[in-house]
Amino acid sequence: MTAALPDLSFHPAWHAQLELAYARAGDATRPVTRRHAGPLRVQKHLYAEGPEVCQHILVHPPGGIAGGDSLAFDVRLGERAWAQLTSPGAAKWYRAACPSRQTLEIHLEPGATLEWLPQESIVFAGAQAELETRIQLRGDARLFYWDMVALGRPASGERFASGHFVAALDIRRDDRLLWHERQRIDGGDRLLDSPIGLAGHPVLATLVASGEIDTDLLQRCRALPCAGRGNLSQLPGGLLVARCLADEALHARAWLIELWRLLRPALLGREAVPPRIWST
Protein backbone atom coordinates (compact mmCIF):
# COMPACT_ATOMS: atom_id res chain seq x y z
CA MET A 1 0.00 0.00 0.00
CA THR A 2 1.36 3.43 -0.97
CA ALA A 3 1.02 6.10 1.72
CA ALA A 4 -0.46 9.42 0.65
CA LEU A 5 1.87 12.39 0.62
CA PRO A 6 1.19 15.08 3.21
CA ASP A 7 -0.76 18.11 2.03
CA LEU A 8 1.77 20.90 2.41
CA SER A 9 -0.18 23.65 0.64
CA PHE A 10 -0.36 25.74 3.82
CA HIS A 11 2.91 24.60 5.35
CA PRO A 12 4.64 27.52 7.15
CA ALA A 13 8.09 27.90 5.60
CA TRP A 14 11.17 26.95 7.59
CA HIS A 15 14.34 29.03 7.23
CA ALA A 16 17.20 27.07 8.74
CA GLN A 17 20.92 27.75 8.98
CA LEU A 18 23.85 25.71 10.25
CA GLU A 19 27.36 27.08 10.66
CA LEU A 20 30.19 24.67 11.45
CA ALA A 21 33.91 25.33 11.87
CA TYR A 22 36.73 22.95 12.74
CA ALA A 23 40.31 23.49 13.90
CA ARG A 24 43.32 21.26 14.39
CA ALA A 25 44.62 21.10 17.97
CA GLY A 26 47.70 18.90 18.26
CA ASP A 27 46.78 15.56 16.69
CA ALA A 28 43.01 16.15 16.94
CA THR A 29 40.35 17.96 14.94
CA ARG A 30 37.95 19.86 17.18
CA PRO A 31 34.63 21.54 16.32
CA VAL A 32 35.09 25.18 17.32
CA THR A 33 31.87 26.67 15.96
CA ARG A 34 28.42 25.12 15.93
CA ARG A 35 25.66 27.66 15.42
CA HIS A 36 22.18 26.95 14.15
CA ALA A 37 18.95 28.75 13.48
CA GLY A 38 15.78 26.84 12.75
CA PRO A 39 15.56 23.06 12.32
CA LEU A 40 19.13 22.12 11.42
CA ARG A 41 21.34 20.32 13.92
CA VAL A 42 24.41 18.17 14.27
CA GLN A 43 24.63 15.21 16.59
CA LYS A 44 27.53 14.82 19.00
CA HIS A 45 30.87 14.65 17.23
CA LEU A 46 32.41 11.19 16.85
CA TYR A 47 35.96 9.92 16.44
CA ALA A 48 35.49 6.45 14.97
CA GLU A 49 38.91 6.66 13.28
CA GLY A 50 40.78 8.35 16.11
CA PRO A 51 41.17 12.03 17.02
CA GLU A 52 42.40 13.23 13.62
CA VAL A 53 39.03 12.81 11.85
CA CYS A 54 35.98 14.50 13.37
CA GLN A 55 32.69 13.02 12.18
CA HIS A 56 29.41 14.88 12.42
CA ILE A 57 25.94 13.70 11.45
CA LEU A 58 23.75 16.46 10.00
CA VAL A 59 20.13 16.27 11.09
CA HIS A 60 17.05 18.04 9.73
CA PRO A 61 14.34 17.12 12.28
CA PRO A 62 11.27 18.01 10.14
CA GLY A 63 12.30 15.21 7.80
CA GLY A 64 11.20 16.98 4.63
CA ILE A 65 11.60 20.22 2.70
CA ALA A 66 8.48 21.97 1.43
CA GLY A 67 7.63 25.08 -0.58
CA GLY A 68 9.34 28.22 0.67
CA ASP A 69 11.74 26.32 2.95
CA SER A 70 15.40 27.27 2.82
CA LEU A 71 18.39 25.43 4.26
CA ALA A 72 21.80 27.10 4.47
CA PHE A 73 25.02 25.32 5.45
CA ASP A 74 28.33 27.07 6.07
CA VAL A 75 31.29 24.74 6.69
CA ARG A 76 34.82 26.00 7.40
CA LEU A 77 37.94 23.99 8.15
CA GLY A 78 41.15 25.50 9.48
CA GLU A 79 44.63 24.36 8.53
CA ARG A 80 45.11 20.57 8.78
CA ALA A 81 41.62 19.98 10.20
CA TRP A 82 39.74 16.91 8.91
CA ALA A 83 35.96 16.57 9.06
CA GLN A 84 33.61 13.95 7.69
CA LEU A 85 29.97 15.02 7.37
CA THR A 86 27.09 12.69 6.57
CA SER A 87 23.36 12.35 7.24
CA PRO A 88 21.13 9.70 8.86
CA GLY A 89 18.73 9.30 5.95
CA ALA A 90 17.38 10.70 2.72
CA ALA A 91 16.39 14.35 2.37
CA LYS A 92 12.85 14.58 1.00
CA TRP A 93 11.78 17.49 -1.21
CA TYR A 94 7.98 17.61 -1.33
CA ARG A 95 5.67 18.93 -4.03
CA ALA A 96 5.10 22.63 -3.60
CA ALA A 97 3.65 25.75 -5.17
CA CYS A 98 6.91 27.67 -4.81
CA PRO A 99 10.63 26.85 -4.77
CA SER A 100 12.54 25.30 -1.87
CA ARG A 101 16.23 26.10 -1.64
CA GLN A 102 19.44 24.76 -0.18
CA THR A 103 22.79 26.54 -0.20
CA LEU A 104 26.10 25.02 0.84
CA GLU A 105 29.25 27.11 1.36
CA ILE A 106 32.51 25.26 2.03
CA HIS A 107 35.85 26.91 2.83
CA LEU A 108 38.97 24.78 3.39
CA GLU A 109 42.30 26.22 4.54
CA PRO A 110 45.66 24.70 3.48
CA GLY A 111 46.10 21.11 4.63
CA ALA A 112 42.42 20.72 5.54
CA THR A 113 40.36 17.70 4.44
CA LEU A 114 36.58 17.53 4.07
CA GLU A 115 34.53 14.47 3.22
CA TRP A 116 30.97 15.53 2.38
CA LEU A 117 29.06 12.24 2.20
CA PRO A 118 25.30 12.77 2.65
CA GLN A 119 22.66 10.24 1.80
CA GLU A 120 20.39 10.83 -1.16
CA SER A 121 17.86 13.57 -1.85
CA ILE A 122 14.43 12.39 -3.01
CA VAL A 123 12.72 15.01 -5.18
CA PHE A 124 9.01 14.20 -5.34
CA ALA A 125 6.92 14.96 -8.41
CA GLY A 126 5.75 18.56 -8.18
CA ALA A 127 8.68 19.67 -6.02
CA GLN A 128 10.64 22.79 -6.94
CA ALA A 129 14.07 21.98 -5.52
CA GLU A 130 16.93 24.42 -6.06
CA LEU A 131 20.42 23.65 -4.70
CA GLU A 132 23.59 25.72 -4.91
CA THR A 133 27.02 24.61 -3.69
CA ARG A 134 30.14 26.79 -3.61
CA ILE A 135 33.48 25.32 -2.52
CA GLN A 136 36.72 27.24 -1.98
CA LEU A 137 39.97 25.32 -1.47
CA ARG A 138 43.13 27.02 -0.26
CA GLY A 139 46.62 25.70 -0.92
CA ASP A 140 46.73 21.90 -0.71
CA ALA A 141 43.29 21.44 0.90
CA ARG A 142 41.63 18.13 0.01
CA LEU A 143 38.00 17.47 -0.90
CA PHE A 144 35.86 14.35 -1.26
CA TYR A 145 32.30 15.34 -2.19
CA TRP A 146 29.29 13.46 -3.44
CA ASP A 147 25.58 13.91 -3.95
CA MET A 148 22.77 11.60 -5.03
CA VAL A 149 19.35 12.62 -6.32
CA ALA A 150 16.30 10.42 -6.92
CA LEU A 151 13.66 12.05 -9.12
CA GLY A 152 10.15 10.90 -8.23
CA ARG A 153 9.60 7.69 -6.30
CA PRO A 154 10.62 4.87 -8.62
CA ALA A 155 9.85 2.14 -6.07
CA SER A 156 6.24 3.36 -5.96
CA GLY A 157 5.98 3.86 -9.71
CA GLU A 158 5.87 7.65 -9.39
CA ARG A 159 7.63 9.44 -12.23
CA PHE A 160 9.00 12.96 -12.04
CA ALA A 161 6.17 14.31 -14.16
CA SER A 162 6.04 17.89 -12.86
CA GLY A 163 8.10 20.38 -10.90
CA HIS A 164 11.81 21.01 -11.36
CA PHE A 165 15.23 20.22 -9.94
CA VAL A 166 18.05 22.75 -10.25
CA ALA A 167 21.60 22.21 -8.99
CA ALA A 168 24.72 24.36 -9.33
CA LEU A 169 28.22 23.36 -8.22
CA ASP A 170 31.22 25.69 -8.22
CA ILE A 171 34.69 24.56 -7.02
CA ARG A 172 37.72 26.87 -6.85
CA ARG A 173 41.25 26.57 -5.56
CA ASP A 174 42.85 29.85 -4.50
CA ASP A 175 40.05 31.61 -6.42
CA ARG A 176 40.87 29.76 -9.66
CA LEU A 177 37.90 27.94 -11.13
CA LEU A 178 38.33 24.16 -11.19
CA TRP A 179 34.79 22.99 -11.86
CA HIS A 180 31.46 24.64 -12.58
CA GLU A 181 28.21 23.07 -13.63
CA ARG A 182 24.57 23.94 -13.55
CA GLN A 183 21.80 21.51 -14.35
CA ARG A 184 18.07 21.93 -14.56
CA ILE A 185 15.69 19.02 -14.93
CA ASP A 186 12.03 19.77 -15.49
CA GLY A 187 9.35 17.23 -14.66
CA GLY A 188 8.10 15.46 -17.76
CA ASP A 189 10.98 16.72 -19.92
CA ARG A 190 12.08 14.49 -22.80
CA LEU A 191 15.63 14.46 -21.40
CA LEU A 192 14.42 12.17 -18.62
CA ASP A 193 14.18 9.33 -21.15
CA SER A 194 16.55 10.54 -23.86
CA PRO A 195 19.83 8.63 -24.38
CA ILE A 196 21.61 12.01 -24.22
CA GLY A 197 19.88 12.74 -20.91
CA LEU A 198 19.03 10.38 -18.05
CA ALA A 199 18.12 7.51 -20.41
CA GLY A 200 15.15 6.51 -18.26
CA HIS A 201 17.17 6.30 -15.03
CA PRO A 202 15.51 8.30 -12.22
CA VAL A 203 18.61 8.39 -9.98
CA LEU A 204 21.71 10.44 -10.70
CA ALA A 205 24.85 10.73 -8.60
CA THR A 206 28.03 12.78 -8.78
CA LEU A 207 31.35 12.36 -6.98
CA VAL A 208 34.10 14.98 -7.08
CA ALA A 209 37.47 14.43 -5.40
CA SER A 210 40.64 16.49 -5.45
CA GLY A 211 43.87 14.79 -6.41
CA GLU A 212 45.31 12.55 -9.09
CA ILE A 213 45.55 8.77 -9.35
CA ASP A 214 47.61 6.44 -11.50
CA THR A 215 46.28 4.62 -14.54
CA ASP A 216 46.01 1.29 -12.73
CA LEU A 217 43.74 2.68 -10.01
CA LEU A 218 41.71 4.60 -12.58
CA GLN A 219 41.05 1.36 -14.46
CA ARG A 220 40.15 -0.47 -11.23
CA CYS A 221 37.63 2.25 -10.43
CA ARG A 222 36.13 2.07 -13.90
CA ALA A 223 35.85 -1.71 -13.61
CA LEU A 224 33.69 -1.56 -10.47
CA PRO A 225 30.29 -3.21 -11.01
CA CYS A 226 27.50 -0.67 -11.33
CA ALA A 227 23.79 -1.56 -11.41
CA GLY A 228 23.24 1.22 -13.90
CA ARG A 229 25.72 3.37 -15.80
CA GLY A 230 28.82 4.72 -14.07
CA ASN A 231 32.19 6.12 -15.05
CA LEU A 232 35.11 8.11 -13.64
CA SER A 233 37.33 10.72 -15.31
CA GLN A 234 40.60 12.38 -14.29
CA LEU A 235 40.39 16.06 -15.23
CA PRO A 236 43.11 18.68 -15.65
CA GLY A 237 43.63 20.74 -12.53
CA GLY A 238 43.67 17.76 -10.17
CA LEU A 239 40.01 16.73 -10.02
CA LEU A 240 38.36 13.34 -10.32
CA VAL A 241 34.71 13.39 -11.40
CA ALA A 242 32.46 10.33 -11.35
CA ARG A 243 28.89 10.01 -12.61
CA CYS A 244 26.26 7.37 -12.10
CA LEU A 245 22.77 6.81 -13.48
CA ALA A 246 20.73 4.14 -11.72
CA ASP A 247 17.19 2.88 -11.22
CA GLU A 248 17.38 2.90 -7.41
CA ALA A 249 19.20 5.11 -4.93
CA LEU A 250 20.70 2.10 -3.15
CA HIS A 251 22.44 1.08 -6.38
CA ALA A 252 23.99 4.53 -6.82
CA ARG A 253 24.96 4.64 -3.15
CA ALA A 254 26.63 1.23 -3.31
CA TRP A 255 28.69 2.31 -6.31
CA LEU A 256 29.79 5.57 -4.67
CA ILE A 257 30.79 3.75 -1.49
CA GLU A 258 32.91 1.27 -3.44
CA LEU A 259 34.60 4.15 -5.26
CA TRP A 260 35.25 5.82 -1.92
CA ARG A 261 36.77 2.58 -0.58
CA LEU A 262 39.20 2.48 -3.52
CA LEU A 263 40.02 6.18 -3.71
CA ARG A 264 40.30 7.17 -0.05
CA PRO A 265 43.60 5.38 0.66
CA ALA A 266 45.18 6.81 -2.52
CA LEU A 267 43.91 10.37 -2.15
CA LEU A 268 43.65 10.80 1.62
CA GLY A 269 46.07 8.19 2.99
CA ARG A 270 43.49 6.35 5.10
CA GLU A 271 41.50 3.17 4.63
CA ALA A 272 37.77 3.74 4.22
CA VAL A 273 35.77 3.19 7.42
CA PRO A 274 32.02 3.50 6.65
CA PRO A 275 30.13 5.57 9.24
CA ARG A 276 27.94 3.38 11.44
CA ILE A 277 24.89 5.47 10.60
CA TRP A 278 24.98 4.04 7.07
CA SER A 279 24.18 0.60 8.50
CA THR A 280 21.16 1.63 10.57
Swiss-Prot record:
Keyword annotations: Chaperone, Cytoplasm, Nickel insertion
Q: Cellular component per GO?
A: cytoplasm
Subcellular localization(s) per the UniProt record: Cytoplasm
InterPro entries, per database record:
UreD (IPR002669)
Question: Which GO MF terms does the UniProt record name?
Answer: nickel cation binding
Record bears the keyword Iron? no
The record lists the membrane-crossing segments as: none
Q: Name one Pfam family in it.
A: UreD
Q: What family does the Swiss-Prot or TrEMBL record give for this protein?
A: Belongs to the UreD family.
What does this chain do?
Required for maturation of urease via the functional incorporation of the urease nickel metallocenter.
Q: How does it assemble?
A: UreD, UreF and UreG form a complex that acts as a GTP-hydrolysis-dependent molecular chaperone, activating the urease apoprotein by helping to assemble the nickel containing metallocenter of UreC. The UreE protein probably delivers the nickel.
Name this polypeptide is given = Urease accessory protein UreD
Q: Which organism is it from?
A: Pseudomonas paraeruginosa (strain DSM 24068 / PA7) (Pseudomonas aeruginosa (strain PA7))
**Gene symbol of the encoding locus:** ureD
